[in-house]
């Protein structure tokens, strides 16, 4: 199963450097804290609509593969993050199987819990980079994060109803 927003997320083209954008846009695109928390600060109830979750092989993650260790399998999670039931963000998380050990096994058991609720409670979370991307007038970003030094890649597409616009 797929969703048009996830297809558009995979079509994002990334800027080589941070573009000169309005401060309000950059505030959203370069946010280093939890996007879930930011959405809740808008006075909204945040929920997750699961699109796809499970193990995939390298051929299913061509966009992410250059940014992650080469492994036989990856945990893929594709969701819509909704505010009061309205989709505001499409998210795609790719986790190398080697990351899924110790406390990070919890990444496979998030279910309808927003990823940010897990990530941003960890004292071992670090971020290698944020890249800004755009496709058909919509903005997105991707970040390589690390939990206990172990990588995962998070890509987010801000949907038209999002307060970013």
UniProtKB/Swiss-Prot annotation:
GO terms for molecular function: chorismate lyase activity. Substrate binds at residues 35, 77, 115, 156. It is found in: Cytoplasm. Its main location: cytoplasm. Keywords: Cytoplasm, Lyase, Pyruvate, Ubiquinone biosynthesis. Its EC number is 4.1.3.40. SUPFAM superfamilies: Chorismate lyase-like. Pathway: Cofactor biosynthesis; ubiquinone biosynthesis. It catalyses: chorismate = 4-hydroxybenzoate + pyruvate. One of its GO terms (biological process) is pyruvate biosynthetic process. Removes the pyruvyl group from chorismate, with concomitant aromatization of the ring, to provide 4-hydroxybenzoate (4HB) for the ubiquinone pathway. Belongs to the UbiC family. This is Chorismate pyruvate-lyase. It comes from Escherichia coli O157:H7. The lineage of its organism: Bacteria, Pseudomonadati, Pseudomonadota, Gammaproteobacteria, Enterobacterales. The gene is ubiC.
